[in-house]
Regions:
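Classical protein tyrosine phosphatase
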Residues: 17-19
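Short beta-strand-initiation
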Residues: 2-4, 13, 33, 37
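Short glycine-aspartate micro-motif
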Residues: 4-11, 127
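A short acidic Gly-Thr/Ser loop motif
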Residues: 9-15, 175
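Phosphate-binding loop and its immediate beta->loop->alpha context
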Residues: 22-158
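Conserved phosphate-binding catalytic cores of ATP/NTP-utilizing and phosphoryl-transfer enzymes
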Residues: 1-4, 155-175
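Short, glycine/acidic-enriched loop or turn micro-motifs at the edges of active sites
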Residues: 13, 132-134, 162
Length: 175
């Protein structure tokens, strides 16, 4: 088993990003629109294509009905803020897919999109930062989403721990 972590992911409620260390410098991988982050937004069109990130967000913004799903019941095809329901039994009804989707499935689509920015075919392991307030069910749901996205080895790191670690590494280099 390999201990090296290849990439770090911020799977955010609003936006998400992927980065790795390159020559000792943390480097965020740019999206196809050359942005550091993508919206944590998923849309399913009538052809059942899955749109993620900026494309999905733009569809949502331009949608005349402005049908978006957070916690209300009803059918929609664009989903945002599903991270808030990770680790619960909440499902999202998607009219174009004629099925219910879990927060883990929607999060997996965001993770797959981030994974697509990576040229490394041997991508093996990742660290995903999670909020400090996440409990075991939410952590397990995040792990499930990563597995659904095809990541083989996943570690979770609480956001304050990640910040302290980064500060410690920076401070250590200045001493």
């Amino acid at each position: 088993m390999r201990n090296k972590i290849d990439y770090g992911i911020d799977l955010g409620t609003t936006n998400s990003a992927i980065a790795r260390m390159e020559n000792g410098v943390p480097t965020i991988k740019k999206s196809e629109t050359l942005k550091d982050t993508i919206p944590s937004c998923v849309h399913f069109n009538k052809r059942q294509d899955i749109l993620v990130g900026d494309t999905a967000f733009n569809v949502m913004k331009n949608d005349n009905t402005r049908a978006l799903k957070t916690f209300e019941s009803g059918k929609t095809n664009t989903f945002i803020e599903f991270k808030r329901t990770m680790g619960t039994t909440h499902n999202y009804e998607c009219s174009n897919m004629s099925k219910n989707l879990t927060p883990e499935e929607l999060s997996a689509e965001v993770l797959k999109k981030l994974k697509s920015f990576i040229q490394d075919e041997n991508l093996y392991s990742i660290v995903i930062t999670v909020p400090a307030k996440f409990l075991n069910p939410q952590n397990e749901a995040t792990m499930k989403a990563a597995k659904l996205a095809g990541f083989k080895h996943v570690q979770l790191l609480q956001e304050p721990v990640a910040a302290a670690t980064a500060y410690g590494l920076t401070a250590k280099n200045k001493d």
